[in-house]
Amino acid sequence: MRRGRSRPAGAAPAALLLPLLLLLPLTGCDRLAAAPAEHAAAAGDPAQDADRGRRLPPVVDHVRTDDPVVFLTYDDGAERDPAFVGLIRERRLPVTLFLTDTVAGPAYGDLARLRPFGASLQNHTLDHRSLRGLPHAGQRAEICGQQTKLRSRFGVRAHLFRPPHGTYDTTTLRAAADCGITALVLWRATLDADGALTYTRGDHRLHPGDIVAVDPDHPTAANLAARTERLLETIEEQGLRVGNLENYL
């Protein structure tokens, strides 16, 4: 897989993740790793940029809330499944789509038509480069460049960012802050090729506030719409519903 702001009633501040260890590289967004390096979760304030005396955006895989909601997130490729697009429209699903310009650019027109049905369009860089280790200027160009694209094509000022492959460093946080990003979004669960959930940490069930990543392009998976339908059944069986991540972060 190339791979809102008032907080709703009952929504508490986002859980903030400040990993003590950098994330290990994933195999790439062409396949979300079944169990990426565990994201150390700790509630607290955003990281402080010692060089500039400013707060850096938190890294989150879970939102602290008492609302019975989980959040469905997709990277580039979801728009290529007409049945998935139809599902979003029919169910008015408030999914979050993280977009890379060089991948999703040709489908921007189709994506724009999903916004009235609840889809949120957020930042996944211009070119899907792995950011960790790149100089500040390079990371800033990737993130701010896509901010400009999203603003010019959709009129949206994205404030959520998913780093390609889930890898980042402190320079990423600084560059993201420069570009107006308020949170880096990872995931606590992924949907595998068979429609089952795999968890990066904690017990193996969904909890209110969990962020779920769905790989649109898994090479051996059933079509995206069918997997999403099965996931929705699991969510409903656990007494949960899909929330709009943009409203909680």
Curated annotation (Swiss-Prot):
Gene Ontology biological process: carbohydrate metabolic process
Alphabetical list of InterPro entries matching this protein: Glyco_hydro/deAcase_b/a-brl, NODB_dom, Polysacc_deacetylase_ArnD
GO MF annotation: an example: hydrolase activity, acting on carbon-nitrogen (but not peptide) bonds
A Pfam family: Polysacc_deac_1
Residues covered by the NodB homology domain: 68-243
Residues making up the signal peptide according to the UniProt record: 1-43
Disordered as annotated region, ranges: 40-59
Full protein name: Uncharacterized protein SCO4760
The species this protein was found in: Streptomyces coelicolor (strain ATCC BAA-471 / A3(2) / M145)
